């Protein structure tokens, strides 16, 4: 640590740990309703930020989507859902099933109804199901912005759910009173709370239709995310608490990344932005790659995103069962060649569809996170540095050979090292040092960073 302390600041990752330790214990509030009644707008209003994908097209939200929320000092989880229709078909039927699961598993439910449209057959069907659930149910009469809207809201008493809360999710009207009522009915701890403490956060990322939702469903053992043959059927990050190998993991299943965020349109653009945020909020990322197809620029870009974010990395080659035996050995060599810069990444060949080798993902994540958490004491680190630089000194630059005076590990998560030198170190030499660090200390599955601080010349002392 230097005198000004600029290189040693562990407060960020310690705060991360405390936030993670709190997850899983909060009660859950599900927000349900027909398509395009304003559920995601209400969720964003509750959160005080844009998290849920919102667009003026019915059915933009297709999954149950969980977000951590805070209101008047009380923690809870708000669960956005796809539009609920009792007689839906195809993909919309799958979405309706997700909303039905949310109704059953939440600690309280907010049913959102468009006050201007009035109670529809779908609203009445939802009300009947909710009344049978025995859960606290709150009726939110949305899009109330006038006296006529107040009258429209009052007409929703007919649903039998008690007094309608007249709100405008768009403008915030009435939302505070609604939340006060909801929180008063919530238990201190959710029924489905995890008792194992803070789960490690995992982001599932990859290009569209590579099998992220299928993998999540295989791990969870239920139809947790909407899976359909159309590419990109998951458009929001979906948090799932899943017990694997005796530990609870928090999976974030993200929308498939488009070729370029700037080229995506509508809700696909917003979903791409949320994918970036999912990687940032995770500790380890599983990058799914289609083993039956050549590695693409999209695949490489996703891997780069994870490395740039400094997250532990597992490469999961999905659809391995579709690769011929004769092709597999050749494919392994191709992977080594194309991903030469990330040979340190954990690699697992799986089939999300059949479950082949999926169990190997947990030890791969555990190893990657152990490397990500690693701290090397200053003594052994500088002993290693002395031996390496004696055998291979830094290259001469501008007629002078820089010396490395001292090294320290500034932070973990990812492991970040600072070298104090008398001159600039070439990028190639820094990569050499990174390779030697990995050979000696491991770090399999984790990016590491090597930063250089050039010692400033001190002014001569006054006599």
From Swiss-Prot:
The record's section on Pfam families has:
KH_dom-like, MMR_HSR1
Q: Which InterPro entries match?
A: AAA+_ATPase, G_ENGA, GTP-bd, GTPase_Der, KH_dom-like, KH_dom-like_a/b, P-loop_NTPase, Small_GTP-bd
Provide one Gene Ontology biological process annotation: ribosome biogenesis
Q: Which family does it belong to?
A: Belongs to the TRAFAC class TrmE-Era-EngA-EngB-Septin-like GTPase superfamily. EngA (Der) GTPase family.
Of the GO CC terms on this record, one is: peptidoglycan-based cell wall
Quaternary structure, per UniProt, is: Associates with the 50S ribosomal subunit.
Q: Does the keyword Nucleotide-binding apply?
A: yes
Where are the annotated coiled coils located? none
Please report the stretch or stretches of sequence annotated as the EngA-type G domain.
27-190, 200-373
Function according to Swiss-Prot or TrEMBL: GTPase that plays an essential role in the late steps of ribosome biogenesis.
Q: Which NCBIfam families match?
A: GTPase_EngA, PRK03003.1, small_GTP
Q: What is this protein called?
A: GTPase Der
Give the keywords, sorted. Answer: GTP-binding, Nucleotide-binding, Repeat, Ribosome biogenesis
> Which amino acids does the record list as binding GTP 2?
206-213, 253-257, 318-321
Q: Which domain of life is it from?
A: Bacteria
Residues forming the KH-like domain are: 374-456
Gene from which the chain derives: der
Q: Which residues bind GTP 1?
A: 33-40, 80-84, 142-145
- PROSITE patterns annotated for this entry? G_ENGA
For this chain, one GO molecular function annotation is: GTP binding
């Amino acid at each position: 640590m230097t005198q000004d302390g600029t290189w040693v600041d562990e407060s960020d990752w310690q705060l991360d740990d405390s936030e993670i330790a709190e997850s899983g214990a909060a009660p859950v509030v599900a927000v349900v309703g027909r398509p395009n009644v304003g559920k995601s707008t209400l969720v964003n209003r509750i959160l005080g930020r844009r998290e849920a994908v919102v667009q003026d097209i019915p059915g933009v939200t297709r999954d149950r989507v969980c977000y951590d929320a805070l209101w008047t000092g009380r923690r809870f989880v708000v669960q956005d859902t796809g539009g609920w229709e009792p007689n839906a078909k195809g993909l919309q039927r799958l979405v309706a099933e997700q909303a039905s699961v949310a109704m059953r598993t939440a600690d309280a439910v907010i049913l959102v109804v468009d006050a201007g449209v009035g109670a529809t057959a779908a609203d009445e069907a939802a009300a009947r199901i909710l009344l049978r659930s025995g859960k606290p149910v709150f009726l939110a009469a949305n899009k109330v912005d006038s006296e006529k809207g107040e009258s429209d809201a009052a007409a929703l008493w007919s649903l039998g759910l008690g007094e309608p809360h007249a709100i405008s999710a768009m403008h915030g009207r009435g939302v505070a009173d609604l939340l006060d009522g909801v929180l008063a009915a919530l238990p201190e701890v959710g029924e489905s709370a995890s008792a194992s403490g803070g789960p490690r956060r995992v982001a599932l990322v990859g290009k569209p239709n590579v099998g992220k939702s299928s993998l999540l469903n295989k791990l969870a053992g239920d139809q947790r995310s909407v899976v359909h043959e159309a590419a990109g059927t998951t458009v929001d990050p979906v948090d799932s608490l899943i017990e694997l190998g005796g530990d609870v993991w928090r999976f974030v299943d993200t929308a498939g990344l488009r070729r370029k965020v700037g080229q995506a349109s509508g809700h696909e653009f917003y979903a791409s932005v949320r994918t970036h945020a999912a990687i940032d909020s995770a500790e380890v990322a599983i990058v799914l790659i289609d083993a039956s197809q050549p590695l693409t620029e999209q695949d490489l870009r996703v891997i780069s995103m994870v490395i740039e974010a400094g997250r532990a990395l597992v490469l999961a080659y999905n659809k391995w069962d579709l690769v011929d035996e004769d092709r597999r050995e050749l494919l392994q060599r191709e992977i080594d060649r194309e991903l030469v810069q990330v040979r340190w990444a954990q690699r697992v060949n799986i089939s999300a569809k059949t479950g082949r080798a999926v169990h190997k993902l947990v030890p791969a994540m555990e190893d990657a996170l152990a490397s990500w958490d690693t701290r090397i004491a200053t003594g052994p680190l500088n002993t290693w540095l002395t031996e390496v630089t004696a055998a291979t000194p830094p290259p001469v630059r501008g007629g002078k050979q820089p010396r490395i005076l001292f090294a320290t590990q500034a932070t973990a998560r990812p492991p970040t090292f600072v070298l104090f030198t008398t001159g600039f170190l070439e990028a190639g030499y820094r990569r050499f040092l990174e390779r030697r660090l990995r050979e000696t200390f491991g770090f399999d599955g984790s990016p590491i960073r090597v930063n250089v601080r050039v010692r400033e010349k001190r002014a001569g002392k006054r006599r």
